[in-house]
A protein has these predicted regions:
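Charged, terminal alpha-helix-loop-beta segments
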Residues: 2-20, 39, 94-99, 112-324
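Short alpha-helix capping/helix-loop boundary micro-motifs
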Residues: 24-34
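Short coil-to-beta transition motif at edge beta-strands of beta-rich domains
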Residues: 34-47
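Short catalytic/ligand-binding loop motif for oxyanion handling, primarily in non-cytosolic enzymes
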Residues: 53-55, 65, 283-284
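Core residues of folded domains in eukaryotic genome-function proteins
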Residues: 54, 89, 240-242
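Aromatic- and Lys/Arg-enriched surface recognition patch
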Residues: 57-131
């Protein structure tokens, strides 16, 4: 199970989320990215006004057809572009703990550091580590309030899909396949112990107990943003980690240089660096080998032929193949 903090744009929307124990994401690629990243059984808090609000468990996910006028949130139309954003992607939540705590607390240091290094709320959500979840589970008090019932007309749901063909794009039901979606699929793939064990074996890191590791999404550093960070969930004496950079296209020499900077910044406790891409030139492979960076090609199956696929189908088709 993972823990996410979800950014909320204004006080009114936060109150609606709290009143109905509901989270909603817009009909945009960032909205669908967040919806795909968060799974049933994960934990979330709302992020607004530099504070973390409450702790919830995700009970159900649904994508709603024709949700433009569906409560509780108002749709927004931007004058310059004429684009209207509404909230078809939704999470039904169960309340666990009630609190409103500043991110300057030590308990939220992992998330606060990401916010500071990114320069603010430029993302829809932030994944926190298990240490943050353990701390959040002890804040405030147990939720005892009854949630309000949301009265909505009968609606239909759909399963969103991704495609590499521009001709089949039809938001919010079919979106272009972007790098952030590949990153999310790989992170969830490596969150499964069997997959992670095979991956660690291939990169020559077999001293770590896969049952004590966690795979996290984007982690901000002074030198950039790590796409996927594998680290010990509860470090004891050592805080060992593995950094992964993900590219949908051809790997470049700049990607190797970026990973090398991450290795230098993280120091001796960074046990490995990995570059995952669609393809590699011989020159990039040689440079990676010289710097001790492992290289993998990803394979995705049906989506490569232009067929729209669901996020779960994407994960099922995903293969990581080591190349040298």
């Amino acid at each position: 199970m993972a823990y996410f903090l979800i950014s909320v744009s204004n006080r009114k929307n936060l109150e609606l989320c709290e009143n109905y124990a509901l989270a909603g994401f817009t009909n945009s690629i960032n909205g669908l990215w967040t919806f795909s990243e968060i799974q049933e059984g994960d934990f979330i808090s709302f992020l607004y006004g530099a504070k973390a609000h409450n702790l919830y468990r995700v009970e159900e996910k649904e994508a709603i057809k024709d949700a433009q006028d569906l409560p509780p949130w108002d749709s927004i139309t931007f004058k310059m572009s004429g684009i209207t954003y509404y909230f078809p992607f939704r999470l039904h939540l169960s309340q666990i703990r009630k609190y409103s705590e500043s991110l300057v607390r030590a308990e939220f240091a992992y998330v606060a550091e990401n916010l500071l290094l990114r320069g603010g709320y430029r993302k829809t959500h932030f994944q926190a580590d298990q240490t943050t979840l353990q701390s959040a589970s002890q804040l405030g008090e147990l939720y005892t309030e009854t949630i309000a019932k949301l009265n909505v007309k009968k609606y239909e749901t759909f399963v969103p899909r991704f495609t590499k063909s521009k001709d089949t794009v039809s938001p919010p039901e079919i979106f272009r396949f972007f790098e952030i979606i590949l990153q999310a699929a790989i992170r969830q793939h490596l969150s499964e112990q069997e997959n992670l064990s095979a991956f660690l074996h291939q990169i020559g890191v077999e001293t770590l107990d896969t049952g004590k590791l966690e795979a996290l999404g984007e982690k901000a550093l002074a030198e950039g943003h790590i796409d996927i960070l594998i680290k010990e969930a509860t470090p004891m004496g050592l805080a060992r980690k593995i950094v992964i950079e993900v590219k949908t296209g051809l790997a470049r020499l700049q990607d190797i240089s970026q990973l090398s900077m991450y290795l230098n910044e993280l120091g001796n406790e960074c046990m490995a660096a990995v570059l995952i891409a669609k393809d590699f030139s011989r020159k990039v492979l040689q440079e990676a080998k010289g710097r001790g960076i492992s290289t993998f090609e990803y394979k995705l199956g049906e989506i490569e032929s232009g067929v729209p696929v669901t996020f779960n189908e994407l994960k099922e088709d995903l293969q990581l193949i080591k190349v040298t």
